[in-house]
Amino acid sequence: MAMKLKDNEALALKSLKDALLQKYDVLDFRVFGSKIKGLDRPDSDIDVMIELAEYNSSIASEIDDIIFEINLAHDDFISVVIFGKKEIEEGPLSESPIYKVCKREGVSL
């Protein structure tokens, strides 16, 4: 699948990935959803799946703040789903429909 990103979207995703890599152990970073399928509209968000080595509510809050600033700076709307490695390996998340779609259809950046 070919993903077509506008310049501001590509910059926003690069900014997000760079910011996360500086602060967290990012295991996977994928774009999925309408942007990948070529079904996005001008008002569509950019769906991103992030898998971290460690994930908790404090990290979730920090990442929300990072995304908020990036969305403002680049006039985008990045929407994320975040998974922790432990929850995937030891819990039911590996069978979650959203996780399966992200792994199957998502484009790794």
Residue ranges of predicted features:
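Catalytic core of pol beta-like nucleotidyltransferases
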Residues: 1-27, 36-42, 52-109
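His-Asp-centered metal-binding catalytic motifs of divalent-metal-dependent phosphohydrolases/nucleases
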Residues: 30
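Short beta-strand->loop micro-motif that forms the acidic, two-metal-ion catalytic signature
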Residues: 46-50
